[in-house]
């Protein structure tokens, strides 16, 4: 039986692409109609590796900002930017993140979920940075601070399944009693399944599963479907997912 519903943050609770594009478009000086989706997806794919290199000391935060952005631009055959431009993007991106909002329907679903389940968050990134997003999204209405686990706190980062085990100990629950909701197949779905959790894939970017080793327990493709899935959990007398 499911007793806890735990969420990823970036591009799961809110649309991460919108602030990314708003910050990057003026830097690369492309028409507003230009689709930067491949650059955004490449930027996200590098998140775990970039974070690991900073925490290990092999990259400075400045070096990460430059290398990560230029690698993402290269993935879309766009020219690299100068270090100054990369840092300007990073500053603009942080400003844009101050305006993030929950995906439509999530607040109503969280209201209902809180009545029946423990709620939590597992997120990669520096604790202060991720908690700032959580506060802007007003997630403290539904989730206690001790049920929010960052990779910096855990000393582990997704896709390491051990971060999910750490959360189980924090919530005093078994893996089989936990479900994780996330947008990234490798970081969220595969990692959660490897830890023995159920996994709900919020595949609103319409991505393909890169391998067939781990199948999500449920897949939804837009915020309305995610709301319906979460509300369905609140109507069950015994979890059947």
Language-model segments: residues:
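Generic recognition of short, well-ordered alpha-helical segments
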Residues: 18-22, 104-108, 132, 161-162
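Asp-based, Mg2+/Mn2+-dependent phosphohydrolase catalytic module
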Residues: 1-5, 111, 126-241
């Amino acid at each position: 039986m499911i007793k806890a519903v735990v969420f990823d943050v970036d591009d799961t609770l809110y649309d991460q692409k919108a602030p990314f594009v708003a910050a990057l478009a003026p830097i690369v000086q492309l028409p507003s109609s230009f689709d930067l989706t491949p650059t955004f997806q490449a930027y996200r794919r590098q998140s775990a590796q970039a974070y690991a290199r900073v925490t290990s000391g092999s990259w400075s935060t400045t070096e990460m900002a430059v290398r990560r952005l230029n690698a993402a631009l290269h993935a879309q055959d766009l020219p690299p930017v100068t270090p100054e431009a990369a840092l300007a993007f990073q500053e603009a991106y942080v400003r844009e993140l101050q305006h993030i909002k929950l995906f439509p329907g999530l607040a109503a679903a969280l209201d209902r979920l809180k009545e029946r389940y423990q709620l939590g968050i597992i997120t990669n990134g520096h604790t202060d940075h991720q908690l700032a997003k959580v506060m802007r999204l007003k997630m403290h209405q539904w989730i206690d601070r001790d049920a929010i686990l960052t990779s910096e706190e855990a000393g582990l980062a997704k896709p390491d399944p051990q971060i999910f085990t750490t959360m189980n100990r924090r919530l005093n629950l078994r893996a089989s009693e936990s479900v994780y909701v996330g947008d990234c197949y490798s970081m969220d779905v595969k990692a959660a399944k490897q830890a023995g959790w159920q996994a709900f894939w919020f595949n609103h970017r319409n991505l393909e599963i890169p391998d067939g080793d781990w199948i999500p327990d449920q897949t939804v493709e837009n915020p309305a479907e995610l709301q319906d899935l979460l509300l369905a959990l609140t109507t069950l007398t015994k979890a059947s997912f």
